[in-house]
C-alpha cells in the first residue's frame, strides 16, 4: 500500500529535481520541508528526549511526566498538532523523510529487516555497498537506543549528490524510536568529528558535498506552523531582513556552538553572556535555570509543574518576547512561539531548563524566528530576522 507520505515525497522530489540546477563543480540548491501527520506527543516527551540527546541528567519529574505520557496514563492529554515537517531525500533508490539535525553527525535510517521498524519508510540496502567491519550505536539517558551497520550509497538532496555517502542502517531500535513515526531517521549536519561509526568515523553529507557548492555554506529557514527550507551553497537575501550578524563557532565538541553576548526578556536587556548550540534537531530552547526562572517570573500564573515535567501556564497568558544578543543584533523569539503546546488544562513552555549541562540549546522554538547561515569553512554562524 502506498501511503500519503510516499506520494507527497515523490511529488516534492520530482518538483525539486525539475527546479534544481544541473550538477556542476559549483552548485547551489534549496530543498523544502514537507508536512507529515504525527500523533499527539506530550511536550515532556520531547523535553526528555532533548536532555537525553546531550547526556544530561533527566530530572525525575520530567522522566515521570514523559513516562506517564508514553504509557497513556497521563492525567492531561496533549492536543495533537496536525503536522510535523521533515525533509525528503533519496538514498540509492529509496525515498526517505529525514529530520535534518545540526546537533548530530550521523545519517541513519531503517531497512526492511530492522527490528522495530514499524510503519517507517525503509532504505533498500541492495543498492548500496556494505562497509566491512563498520558499525554504529547511539544510546541516550532516557533509555532510547539504536544500532546497526553501514552502507555506502548515492544520496541526493535537492540538486546535489554525494556519490559515496555513509548510510547507517539500524538493525535494531528501541521503542522510543520505532514509535516516533514522524520521520524515517536523521541526517546529521553537525561536525564529522562526532560521527558515531566505528572503527572509522564517516563524513556528514555536508562535508561530502561542500567542495561542490558555489559557497561552502548551508542556511536554514524553519517556519512557525509551516514548512521551511534548507539552502545549500548560497545565501538567499530574500529570506531575511537587514544584515546577517556573524559570530564565531567553537566546534571543539563537534557542535555549532557559539557565545551569545547576552539576553533580554520583553525588550529589557542586561542579561549576561552564555554558551549555546544552534540545533535544528531539538524542539525546545533549553537555558540555565536562572534564565528560565527569570523568564517565567514575567508570566502571570506560570509554575514549574512537576506533574507536567516543566514550566506551564494558562494558555491565554501573554508571554514576553525573549531576545538573544549576538554582537549588536538581537535575535528575538516572539512570545507566541514560546507558548509551545497544550497539555490539556495548561500550556507547556518552549523555554525550559538545560538541567545544568553547561551550555544552552537553541532549538526550533528559537530557529523558527531566524534565517541562520552555517559556514563550516570559516567556522561561523550568521543570524538575521526572517523576512
From Swiss-Prot:
Compartment(s): Secreted
GO BP terms, alphabetized: proteolysis
GO cellular component: a single term: extracellular region
Entry-linked InterPro entries: Aspartic_peptidase_A1, Aspartic_peptidase_AS, Aspergillopepsin-like_cat_dom, PEPTIDASE_A1, Peptidase_aspartic_dom_sf
Range of residues in the leader sequence: 1-19
Keyword NADP applies: no
UniProt-listed PANTHER family: ASPERGILLOPEPSIN-1-RELATED, BETA-SITE APP-CLEAVING ENZYME, ISOFORM A-RELATED
Record protein name field: Penicillopepsin-1
Gene coding for it: pepA
Amino acid at each position: 500500500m502506498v501511503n500519503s507520505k510516499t506520494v507527497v515525497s515523490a511529488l516534492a522530489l520530482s518538483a525539486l529535481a525539475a527546479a534544481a540546477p544541473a550538477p556542476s563543480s559549483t552548485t547551489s540548491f534549496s530543498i523544502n520541508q514537507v508536512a507529515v501527520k504525527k500523533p499527539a506527543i506530550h511536550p515532556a516527551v520531547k523535553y526528555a528526549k532533548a536532555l537525553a540527546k546531550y547526556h544530561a541528567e533527566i530530572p525525575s519529574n520530567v522522566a515521570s511526566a514523559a513516562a506517564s505520557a508514553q504509557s497513556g496514563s497521563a492525567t492531561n492529554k496533549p492536543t495533537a498538532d496536525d503536522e510535523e515537517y521533515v525533509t525528503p531525500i533519496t538514498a540509492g533508490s529509496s525515498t526517505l523523510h529525514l529530520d535534518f539535525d545540526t546537533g548530530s553527525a550521523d545519517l541513519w535510517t531503517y531497512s526492511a529487516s530492522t527490528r522495530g521498524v514499524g510503519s517507517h519508510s525503509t532504505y533498500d540496502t541492495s543498492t548500496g555497498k556494505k562497509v566491512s567491519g563498520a558499525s554504529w550505536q547511539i544510546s541516550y539517558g532516557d533509555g532510547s537506543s539504536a544500532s546497526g551497520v553501514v552502507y555506502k550509497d548515492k544520496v541526493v538532496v535537492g540538486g546535489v549528490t554525494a556519490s559515496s555517502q555513509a548510510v547507517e542502517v539500524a538493525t535494531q531500535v528501541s521503542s522510543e524510536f520505532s514509535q516516533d513515526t514522524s520521520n524515517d531517521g536523521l541526517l546529521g549536519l553537525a561536525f564529522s568529528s562526532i560521527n558515531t561509526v566505528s572503527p572509522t568515523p564517516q563524513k556528514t553529507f555536508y562535508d561530502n558535498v561542500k567542495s561542490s557548492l558555489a559557497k561552502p555554506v548551508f542556511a536554514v529557514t524553519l517556519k512557525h506552523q509551516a514548512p521551511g527550507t534548507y539552502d545549500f551553497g548560497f545565501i538567499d537575501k530574500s529570506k531575511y531582513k537587514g544584515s546577517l550578524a556573524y559570530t564565531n563557532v567553537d566546534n571543539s565538541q563537534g557542535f555549532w556552538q557559539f557565545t551569545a553576548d547576552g539576553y533580554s526578556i520583553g525588550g529589557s536587556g542586561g542579561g549576561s553572556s552564555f554558551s549555546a548550540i544552534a540545533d535544528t534537531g531539538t524542539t525546545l530552547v533549553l537555558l540555565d535555570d536562572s534564565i528560565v526562572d527569570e523568564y517565567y517570573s514575567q508570566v502571570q500564573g506560570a509554575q514549574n509543574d512537576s506533574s507536567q515535567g516543566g514550566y506551564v501556564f494558562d494558555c491565554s497568558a501573554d508571554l514576553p518576547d525573549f531576545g538573544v544578543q549576538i554582537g549588536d543584533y538581537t535575535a528575538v523569539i516572539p512570545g507566541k512561539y514560546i507558548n509551545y503546546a497544550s497539555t490539556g488544562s495548561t500550556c507547556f513552555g518552549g523555554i525550559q531548563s538545560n538541567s545544568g549541562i553547561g551550555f544552552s540549546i537553541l532549538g526550533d522554538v528559537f530557529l523558527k524566528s531566524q534565517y541562520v547561515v552555517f559556514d563550516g569553512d570559516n567556522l561561523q554562524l550568521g543570524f538575521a530576522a526572517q523576512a
